[in-house]
Amino acid sequence: MTDDAVTGSQDDAEIEIRFNSDGLVPAIAQDADSGEVLMLAYVSPTALKRTRETGQAHYYSRSREELWKKGETSGHTQHIREIRADCDADTILYLVEQTGGACHTGHQSCFYRTLDGTEVTERVFDPETVYE
């Protein structure tokens, strides 16, 4: 295993994840039961390794430039059921069991509004009380 690649097993063939020039890949989190897309974030090799070791979703924050465990502050965690790679191995999919809302705005999914700004889902928690 190299610093810029993390491998995973699929059908007994190792898949080498193709991290971009910043050392990241997009990671889509999807509810394993409902199929709802919850969020898109970025993953570094370390975040992917930690996710595989712990069974809890870890990501890399581009704004804070640090590794973070989903739910570390809010308690709204993502338990990993399966990790998949796309056909080009440059995007990954976390199939998760979501505890609480996935979005820091209080919604179940980060995709809670249309392009014209209409909110199509209700909040599942109050972010002001969670992120005091």
Curated annotation (Swiss-Prot):
A cellular component annotation (GO) from this entry: cytoplasm
GO MF entries: magnesium ion binding; phosphoribosyl-AMP cyclohydrolase activity; zinc ion binding
Binding, Zn(2+): 87, 103, 110
Cofactor remark: Binds 1 Mg(2+) ion per subunit. Binds 1 zinc ion per subunit.
A Pfam family it matches: PRA-CH
First-tier enzyme category under EC: hydrolase
Residues that, per the record, bind Mg(2+): 86, 88, 90
Metabolic or biological pathway: Amino-acid biosynthesis; L-histidine biosynthesis; L-histidine from 5-phospho-alpha-D-ribose 1-diphosphate: step 3/9
Keyword list, A-Z: Amino-acid biosynthesis, Cytoplasm, Histidine biosynthesis, Hydrolase, Magnesium, Metal-binding, Zinc
Biological role stated in the UniProt entry: Catalyzes the hydrolysis of the adenine ring of phosphoribosyl-AMP.
HAMAP family in UniProt: HisI
Family stated for the protein in its record: Belongs to the PRA-CH family.
Protein name: Phosphoribosyl-AMP cyclohydrolase
Originating organism: Haloquadratum walsbyi (strain DSM 16790 / HBSQ001)
